[in-house]
Amino acid sequence: MNKYVTGLFLLVASVSFSQTDTTSSGKNKVWKNLKYDFEVTAKSVGNAFTQPTRWNKNDFITAGGIVAGTSFLYLADNEAQDFFLRQEKEIPDVVQDFGWYFGSPQNFFIASAGIYGFGLITDNPKVRRVGVLVVSSAVASGIMQSVAKTVVGRSRPMNGGHDSFDFFSKEPGYHSFPSGHAVLTFTLAHAVAKQFDSFWVKAGIYAVGSVAPISRLWVNAHWVSDVGLGMALSIVVVDGVDNFMNKQSYYNYKKPKTINWSLRAGYQTIGLVGTF
C-alpha cells in the first residue's frame, strides 16, 4: 500500500512540477519576445528617420510625386472644402461616429496594442510582426507629422484660409498640416492590408481606413491637402519599415503549407485533387 501511495505522490509531484516549468517557460518566452520586439521597434523607427540618406533615384521620384500631388490638392483646397461640407448632412451618423472614434489616437493605440498583444500571448510571430510594423510606423510617422504641424503652422479651415500660416505656432488651430488622423488610421490600414493578396480584401481595408481621414473634411477640421499628405506619408513610412524588417530578417516564420485544389475528370470519374 505504501508503495502505491509513494508512486501516486511522485506522479502528482511530477505533473505539478511539469506544469510549473511549462508556465515559467511560457512567461520567460513572452518576456524574451517582448524584449526582442522592443529592440526591433527601436531599430525600425531609427531607420525610418535615417532612410532619406540612403534614397535612390526611385525614392526621389516618389518624393517628387508626393510633393506634386500635395501641391495639386493645395490648389483644390477651397473647392474640395465646399464639396465635403455639402455632403456632411447626407452622411449617416453611424459613419461619422465611426470616423471620429476610429481616428482618435487612443482608439488607434488600443487597436494596435490588441493586434500585437494577441500575437505575443499566442506566440504567433506573423501577428507579432504586424503589430511591430504598425507601432514602429505609427511612432515614426507620428513624430514626423507632429514636428511638421508645429513648424508649418497651417491654419485649420475653421480658423482661416488655406494659405494662412503661423510658423512654429503652439495654437491647435494652426496645427492642420498634415492630418494626424489620416496618418494614424492609414498607417494601420496599410500595414494590415499588406498582409493579404486578395484585391477585394485590400480594397475593403483601405475603404474602412479612409473613413476617418475623410470625416475630418466633413467636420471642417482639415484641408484636403492635409489629408492627402497624411495618407501618403503613412504609406511611405509603412513600406520603408516593412522593407527594413524584411532585409534584416527579423521575423522568420514558416508559412503554412497550402493545398492547391484542382478538378480532375476521367473515364466515368470526376473528383477534386489536392496537391501539397
Regions from the PLM with identified roles:
Residues A13-V15:
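N-terminal signal peptide c-region/cleavage motif recognized by signal peptidases
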Residues L85-D97:
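Perimembrane loop-to-helix junctions flanking transmembrane segments
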Residues F118:
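Active-site microenvironments of hydrolase-like enzyme catalytic domains
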Residues D77-Q87:
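Membrane-interface helix-loop junction between the first two transmembrane segments
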Residues G69-E79:
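Alpha-helical transmembrane segments of multi-pass membrane proteins
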Residues A63-V67:
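Alpha-helical transmembrane segments
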Residues F109-I115:
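Hydrophobic cores of alpha-helical transmembrane segments in multi-pass inner/ER membrane proteins
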